[in-house]
Amino acid sequence: MTTTETPRKVDTGSVRTPAKKQPRSGRRGGLRSAVSATTLLWILAALYGIPVLWFVLSSFKPAGDLFSLPLTLLPHNPTLSGYKEAWDSANFSQYFINTAFVCVITTILTVGASCCTGYALAKYDNKWLKFFFLCILATTMLPSEVMLAPEFLVVRDLGLYNSFGGIILPAVLTATGCFMFRQFFLTVPDELVEAARIDGARELSIFLRIMVPISRPIMLTLAILSFQWRWNDYIWPLLMLNDPEKFTVQIGIQSLVGAQNINWSVLLGGSVISMIPLIAVFLVFQRYVMNADINAGLKD
């Protein structure tokens, strides 16, 4: 008895077709675009980095070598005399304490006020809030010098002249901070807020327990920017303060400039000293600036 084997049907759906090779021209085009983008980034980094590098290295040069020809990037006889003389000639320790106090208090108030304002502008539907937001944006179209005179008169009438409060109060609410928080809260789904309201949460609880934690990246970003703005602020503290014991770092650097001549080695040393806290703050907090998963509390 013989058996005949019937041929099996080939499942055409399970047969994998060999992947088509990408044309070399397409791969070359992608490589060229990547190389060109990388080259452009390196050029931009050099344009920004070389002046800063020259500035820092020049602070280690003696005063006589700064303008000697030919100009060189690296100091031939590196010295710390500029740093020492800058620290001794100006009361930098007191300036650092004053500036740090102003920056920390202003940053905390700026982040808190901007977060509350941005949440109200994003999640409450009111025509007056929209008009208020337009007024906030309109302030960005005015030069800062235009606002100096009215701000000075208001602060003087409040009795805050020659005080840290006079520096802190006008800098609390910023249009940039309100805009950043508003745009972030607009990306938060309204279902997240409605779900919390259905569960019986109050508005203050929704804001503090839900909105504030998920807005941490924006809070840290604004905190870094606000700290930088206040640390580098020069014009407003110069108008507000006349007591040398209350001067900030930037006014202290200006005091290093003589009436007849400028000791550039001392000025560069003081400027580099003033940069150290900003660099430290940025290096510490930059890793916390990341995107948050705002959809974690939503159900499909």
List each model region and its residues:
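Small/flexible residues
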Residues: 10-11, 18, 26-30, 63, ...
